From Swiss-Prot:
Record has Cell division as a keyword: yes
Top-level division of the source organism's lineage: Bacteria
Pfam families cross-referenced by the UniProt entry: HTH_WhiA, LAGLIDADG_WhiA, WhiA_N
DNA-binding region, residues: 274-308
Molecular function (Gene Ontology), one example: DNA binding
PANTHER family named among the record's database cross-references: CELL DIVISION PROTEIN WHIA-RELATED
UniProt entry keywords in alphabetical sequence: Cell cycle, Cell division, DNA-binding
Similarity section: Belongs to the WhiA family.
Function field: Involved in cell division and chromosome segregation.
Database matches in NCBIfam families: DNA_bind_WhiA
Gene: whiA
Name this polypeptide is given: Probable cell division protein WhiA
């Protein structure tokens, strides 16, 4: 089972009070529902590919409106072989849509009805219903952080974005070919959203994976940094040894001033050690990294003068 499916399975087991059930149902029917006319009777069909979501829709409609609901199962055509579950009710169709703020004066509305998001719990419930209806979230173990909710109507996506941002989630929306999506990209905001809609088990799993990923990334960055520093140290040491050998060949190390002669010999004998370690091996007492670096720079400058055929003064 995918991370998104596990999360939806958890969300469908949450107990809610009647007004919160209405808010959740309002999102589910608005986003996945359709109204049709059969035998001069209005029929509501709510469609989903998730079996637990279908059971949730079934139980919420029966509980809130006390009407008969049937679940139909269809096989999806084309490449995907998922089942399609249709929750159908032929009773009180217009009354249900009107009470859920989906139908107003006989006209379908695309905006989120204010009566469905009157308080904090109802807003959370509406967002939970929206995620159950059109939500998906990447597996945090294998993918980049991404959570989105698909809406067929752009104005509903805008309303959903605004509702999510009332909780400072930094949600954004954009148009897609067959609708619009409201999405989150930041791991911290996805965690906040999971908590907001009651997905606490999903939140714990998400945070566990996030911590491991962050630690792994930190270690990788540290290793890369150490590797880069080591490469720089090795390159610098090779250049220094090359310069010292050139000086020895052309002038002779024994002809260098004492301070340069000693550091030159230590560097040639210990090509792998750091500047700090070089400084600790000086016979007159430890000298700082900057002191060692200053002497080695003088040796490099001297070698450059030899290469350029310049006059040398020791």
């Amino acid at each position: 089972m995918s991370f998104a499916s596990e999360m939806k399975n958890e969300l469908t087991r949450i107990d809610v009070e009647e007004m919160n059930a209405k808010a959740e149902l309002s999102a589910l029917i608005r986003m996945n529902g359709a109204l049709s006319l059969s035998n001069q009777q209005f029929v509501i069909n709510v469609q989903t590919e998730n079996a637990t979501t279908a059971r949730r829709i079934y139980s919420l409609i029966k509980r809130v409106f006390n009407v008969e609901v049937e679940i139909l199962v269809r096989k999806k055509m084309k490449l995907k072989k998922n089942n399609i579950y249709i929750c159908r009710t032929k009773m009180k169709a217009k009354e249900i849509l009107d009470e859920l703020g989906i139908l107003k004066d006989g006209i379908f509305t695309h905006e989120i009805d204010h009566s469905m998001i009157q308080d904090d719990e109802m807003r959370r419930s509406y967002l939970r219903g929206a995620f159950l209806a059109g939500g998906s979230v990447n597996n945090p173990e294998t993918s980049s952080y991404h959570l989105e909710i698909f809406s067929q109507n752009e104005s509903h996506a805008e309303g959903l974005t605004k509702l999510m941002n009332s909780y400072e989630l930094n949600a954004k929306h954009l148009e897609r070919k067959k609708g619009s999506i409201t999405y989150l990209k930041e791991a911290e905001k996805i965690s906040d959203f999971l908590s907001l809609i009651g997905g606490y088990q999903a939140l714990l799993k998400f945070e566990d994976v996030r911590i491991v990923r962050d630690m792994r990334n930190s270690v990788n960055r540290l290793v890369n940094c150490e590797t880069a520093n080591l490469n720089k140290t090795v390159s610098a040491a090779m250049k220094q040894v090359e310069s010292i050998k050139l000086i020895d060949k052309e002038i002779g190390i024994e002809n260098l001033p004492d301070r340069l002669r000693e550091i030159a010999r230590i560097r040639v004998e210990h090509q792998e050690i750091s500047l700090k370690e070089l400084g600790e091996m000086v016979s007159t007492g430890p000298i700082s990294k900057s002191g060692v670096n200053h002497r080695l720079r003088k040796l490099n400058d001297l070698a450059d003068k030899i290469r350029n055929g310049e006059q040398i003064e020791l």
